Amino acid sequence: VAEIMGKEMMDAAGLTTLEAMRAATPEQLDAAFGAFMATGKVQGLPLVPHIDGRLLGKSFTEAATDNTIADVPYMLGSTLDDMMPTMGEGIDAFAALRETQTKNPVYAYRFDRRLPGEPNTAYHSSELWFMFKTLKNSRRPFTAADYELADRMMDYWTNFAKFGNPNGNNVDGEWKPDTKENPFTMHLDIK
């Protein structure tokens, strides 16, 4: 289905050869995607992993339900103005499921900082500037508080990579695991 949809989208944009697709500008590809989405042929999220039976045998949801995903701590999150406003509900459901399967925790976050400048939103992936401390590479007028948030987030992600806990060795830190009995989402924003 993904290949058929991709071909249909490229054909409609006049990009019928591999050479034409490679030569297309990002703006042309974005316009082709927008025009294809406007046809209403796609329901739900169009940019999801393609389950082809070779590289990916099942969806993440199926693998989680079957308990065939890695038995490790997980950190999952979204942004305040994400394209899927119900993302948090899915994260809570995943955390509740994992709680029945393993003792490893799930940590949930929501990035709430609406970026300065235009667009003034916490759009999908806007937390990446902070996670990787690349604020200085952006055209946006970030403040000292933004740099403090980036430092805090870098500490959380580094601790999670090292210890499986964003609080590091302090297992009783401020970022609690997301559980069925005690749902918890760390809201990341400037103070």
Residue ranges and their predicted role:
Residues 38-63:
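Mobile cap/lid helix-loop segments that gate and shape the active-site cleft of serine hydrolases
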Residues 1-15, 23-24, 28-35, 62-191:
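C-terminal helix-and-tail extensions that cap enzymatic domains
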